[in-house]
Amino acid sequence: MSLEKLLNREENDSSKRTDFMGRWYLKMSKICERDDREMDYQNWKFLSYQEFELINEWNQQGKELTKDNCERLLVNMDKTHKEWVEYQKFKEQKDAIIAELKESIQIIKQEPSIPSGADANSVVSSDTEQIQDSETTANSKKSPAINGIKTSGKSPTKSPATNGRRRGAGGNRRVKRPSNLSKTVRSRNATDGDENGNENIENGGTTPKRRSRPKKILVSNVSKDVDAEEEDDIHTEKDASGSAADLDKDIVDESINDSENAPRKRPVSSTSLLSRNKSNKPTKSSPLTPDSAREKENVNGVTEGNEDMDHDSVLDADDSAIGSDDNPNDEQEEADDENVDEEAEDENDEAEVEDDIDDLGAPEDDGDDDFAPSYSAISKVKVNKKVNIDSPMPAIQKELRKMAIKSSVAKAMKRKFTNCKVISYSPESQLEIKITLKQLHIRKYKRHLAEEERKRKAEEALIKAEEEAKKRKLAPPPPPPPQQVRRVEHDLPTYGMKITLKEARAIQRHYDQTYITIWKDMARRDSGRISRQLQQIQSIRGQNFRKTSSLCAKEARRWQMRNFRQVKDFQTRARRGIREMSSFWKKNEREEREMKKKAEKEAIEQAKKEEEQRENLRAAKKLNFLLTQTELYSHFIGSKIKTNELEGTMTDDSLTSMSNNKNKVVDLTKTAASKTNVESIDFATEDDEKLRLMAAQNASNALKETQDKARKFDEEDEEDGELNFQNPTSLGEITIDQPKMLACTLKEYQLKGLNWLANLYDQGINGILADEMGLGKTVQSISVLAHLADRYNIWGPFIVVTPASTLHNWVNEISRFVPQFKILPYWGNANDRKTLRKFWDRKHLRYGRDAPFHVMVTSYQMVVSDASYLQKMKWQYMILDEAQAIKSSQSSRWKTLLSFHCRNRLLLTGTPIQNNMQELWALLHFIMPSLFDSHDEFSDWFSKDIESHAESNTELNQEQLRRLHMVLKPFMLRRIKKNVQSELGDKIEIDVLCDLTFRQAKLYQVLKSQVSGGYDAIENAAGNDDVTSDQKLVNLVMEFRKVCNHPDLFERADVMSPFSFVSFGESASLSREGDFVEVNYSAKNLINYNLPRLIYDELVVPNYNNDVDVRAKLLYHTMNIFHPANSFQLCFILSKLTDTSPNKFATLLEQNVINRAIDLQNDGYFNTAKYSIAYDEGEKIFSSNLLINDKLKYLHLLKNSTSGSVLKNLLEIPSSVYENEYFNSISPAYHPAASAPPINIDVLASNNFVQKKQYEMFNPSISSALSSIPSSVQHKLIVEKGIPIEELPVTEMAPKAFNNSFTSYIEMPSMDRFITESAKLKKLDELLVKLKEEDHRVLIYFQMTKMMDLMEEYLTYRQYTHIRLDGSSKLDDRRDLVHDWQTKPDIFIFLLSTRAGGLGINLTAADTVIFYDSDWNPTIDSQAMDRAHRLGQTRQVTVYRLLIRGTIEERMRDRAKQKEHVQQVVMEGKAKENKQKIIEVEKEHSESA
């Protein structure tokens, strides 16, 4: 059994205590962290608020700052400085005192340890006296002026016992604990180590009474005074080998800590502490425990003096009364004592938790008294100092030393609980303890002895039973020692009685029911009460938390308000001073910074200027070096192939003269070939002559590499064993005649081009044939292939790569000009191309006249997709038609074709420059990679100067332009039409400017208002290339272009029709019917009206009750003069005149108007007379009277009798012209919102009404007379059935509508409005009428296929014959469309897409080109218009370009002109005058909305 169990209470389970402490530690750690964060936030908030107020006040005071105020401010600043100096002195004094204390501590530590057998009490007393002396010295050195150190002026009256105790304590001074600490202040009991009590014994003094001090001390808001000795309660952890000196060291350290905090402490008299402690009565929140009661008794013992003896006598009496074993209430008292012990242990646990919380306290704030804990919070803290056998040795020694000091007191108070005295103690040899057990501990000890005795007896019985079982070789189960063995029968207890099975079962059932009833009562009665108690505890706890937090917040606010008022004036002055000083220093720093930046900027600009000068000089030398090497190479090649002579007189004379005046040219054949890297040359130090020599060596090396490459290609072919004449013996000048196998006659300039191409092939150099479109680049390239086959017996393989639209054109041209060539058309799907690849064998095939193919014609798409197959072939010659397709050096086409293995490459393009100089460099690098290897250098040479000249009309460097022409001449041949074709006249270009219509202007304005970036950015995007502009801006440009073309590109006009309030009948499946289906009248109104039978019978149907029949008789019989019964003589006369019998008169009177008209048309004599006139059959009828027939009159009556209205059209020519010109243009001014058939009327249970209604609505004779009979039915009646014409039923008697617009309520969109809503379409409509009259044929180019759809509707409305070609047209369809246009002159208009129909096709049948909208690239439009303006054109070509004034199209046109100017400068060397004619269409103010 542990020492703690014997001295105090039983120890709880260690595992439960560990879990409990861990949970509380985590919970309180979170609370402390939250409190720290909240405290930091409040401090930051208050300091920020103070700083803000301080700056505001300084700003306000700065406005009113005068001379007096400035002097006053300086005085205050001096005063503050002096205070700060005094504070520094005080701090230095404090540090000196602490240093002295530490020196004294070091002296104490250096003393020898306590020897064995020495008196521990004397050592402790001497140490305590030294510490007290040091404290007294430290307190005496401190200045009394320092705040926080106050001595007690008066000493309260004390009892003799108290005075004696204070004298026995050696005059200990009480030191104040720091006020900002939030830890609970704890005090020791009188029995917890009064080290000074031993001093009186040694001095022979009387034994003092047990010293009692309150355990909880209330710390006031002003000052918190505690005894310095209370710091000894701090827990210390020492090693097991520690000695008594370690304990003294702990006490000294605690004293030092108290001395360091001395400026914030003041002593408090013991009387004030006692009186404060008396007021702390136990409450509900802090119940009175045995420890607290004992402390209460100790405190009372200090003031009451001799009352302790009476109290002890009472306790002894109680002990004697309780200690008797015969007391019947012992068990109840033991249970109560156990409850008391458990409560005390719980309180000790709570005290330990609170001690841990104190260790995790929030950061301390000096001078912050407002947040000091209240007494209620402090009173809950319990001191827990438990020492057991397992505790460290220093703690056990300390506890034993305290016990020894207590035992030295002569008379100890009798206690209710266990008392322990240490009789003698030696740390190494002896420990003698006298323990007096009383009350609870005696009973527990007795129970413990009885339990041990029972266990011993049980173990002995078990051992004895096991021994007996071993003897009998049986192992009976050990009997349970504490339980009573009951006799059991039939698995039921008998309770020591003889009972039957039935009785036992009844007793067991009664027991079970009683057991269950007890548990039910407990669950029903106690569970709710426990739950309510738990909820009540939680609610009370929450209320306490809320109250505490509200009080804390209230105290914090009160503290802030108080401090705010005190510092307000100081903040105002400080703010003004800060503002003035900050403004002054900011201004000063800004001026210095500006001066420094200015100086740095000037230095940087000067350095940059010098660097630019050096770089310009270096770049000029580098440019001169590169150009010199290129010019030498170009001059050498040009002298061999004579490009200048072939081009004719198209170049500028000034450039030619400047070229003639050039310095002497170096002969590359005599110059050593060596390559010098440009990056390794230092252009700043090398001289010009050396650079010129290195340039000549590089040019010679490039020439040698080119020739070696061609020679190597030829040698590889020779190694294959093919016998041909591919290697000419010399490189001399060759004059070539037209090849014999060429089935055409070349013109003079085309023959010159053939010579140039042949010379290029002989030199092994690639070239660009850039003749203007329409000069026969195709036939020249075909002629050079024929030349190779005719002269050198080189039959291939040749490859021609062309756009998809010209594939068939190339096949046709090669077949027509060189029939001996076998052509392989390589296009189609994957399976078709796989079959075509069987025509060549890359290993053993020799290309001669009998080869499977000579020329392969394919497209750029096929080259990219089947590059893996085509790259393995060794092509003799590659021709790229429309080479602007590889204008981008980053495209896959360019990279794939560059990797092909071929001897020579020829590029065919009419526009080598479309947008910028980069495209020209891509073509040059493709044919000569060794010379034109850097685009950046090429751009520095030419691009920037020429493009800036075209854009801003700056001065052009003629020397640079001359050098560009010198570089390009050997590789490019270009002729224009006016220099080589005198029979082909210049085309006329006309820009037609139109104004926006009202609807277009509104849409354009709406789009401009919705653009966020501004309309100027849109116009800039329209002026730039589509590949370089922002894609979003390009999309907006397209929207504006749609408005300019036609508003219906956004939204088409809808077909309008009224709401049909009708139900239609549903028919069966029409698949089983014939060509014609009879459909009955099935349209019915959704409204049905039931006419009452009585009304119908009495008012409508004649009978005896009404006079309907009588009135009809009077109207149609009695009062009718034409009735035979009334006037027979008149009827007889009329019958003679009209050839009508009286009976017929009577019949006609009974009929309605429709039946009369039908009978008149069906009259046999009348029809016979009509048809005899119509069909020239003569008079075949007999008449007793003379009848004069007016043939013209009868012809008008017969106009509806012929099928197809042939006779009607012949008879109504004047009226039809009048109607077409005037009446057909009239449209209804009103369109009903709804339409419906008549309301259905029914009479219930009346068959007469149903029959009459059916007869009136569906009379066959009336229906056939009002409608027309189809032609097929008429043919069947006359031819197949043989019915005479005169017996055919009468038809088309219904009156016709005013015009087609009045035939139906359905309103179709007006085509006239469709035309007038677009300014371009309106102008085009007028232009086409003029061109149709003058017998022109027109090509109309579009950028948008949707606009082509609208144009087809317009052409259909105007009945113009037209065909269409766009990107969706197949290759076969394109060939057929071009053939139809060239061979069928009745086709008036050809609609084409600029991208699809502007490349490589011949449309010379047209003499007029109209651009409905222009392309971004002007060369695309040039190629499109040259489809008609080319060889074979015999008529004057006119080009119209439709533009909208003041819109984005004008900006695009200006940019296109700049690009054209770049082409003119590069190709021709000078700007060409603009010969375009501009026609402005004046704005019509009468345009319809």
Curated annotation (Swiss-Prot):
It holds the Pfam family Helicase_C. Residues 518-643 form the DBINO domain. Keywords: Activator, ATP-binding, DNA damage, DNA repair, DNA-binding, Hydrolase, Nucleotide-binding, Nucleus, Transcription, Transcription regulation. Residues 198-207 have a biased composition (Low complexity). Residues 235-252 have a biased composition (Basic and acidic residues). Coiled coil: none annotated. GO terms for biological process: DNA repair; DNA-templated transcription; regulation of macromolecule metabolic process. One of its GO terms (molecular function) is histone binding. It catalyses: ATP + H2O = ADP + phosphate + H(+). Residues 1323-1479 form the Helicase C-terminal domain. It comes from the Eukaryota. It is an enzyme of class 3 (hydrolase). ATP binds at residues 771-778. Its EC number is 3.6.4.-. Residues 112-375, 467-487 are annotated as: Disordered. Residues 122-142, 149-162, 179-190, 268-289 have a biased composition (Polar residues). The keyword Transmembrane does not apply. A motif (DEAQ box) lies at residues 881-884. It is found in: Nucleus. Residues 305-319, 327-371 have a biased composition (Acidic residues). Residues 758-930 form the Helicase ATP-binding domain. Belongs to the SNF2/RAD54 helicase family. ATPase component of the INO80 complex which remodels chromatin by shifting nucleosomes and is involved in DNA repair. Component of the INO80 chromatin-remodeling complex. The DBINO region is involved in binding to DNA. This is Chromatin-remodeling ATPase INO80.
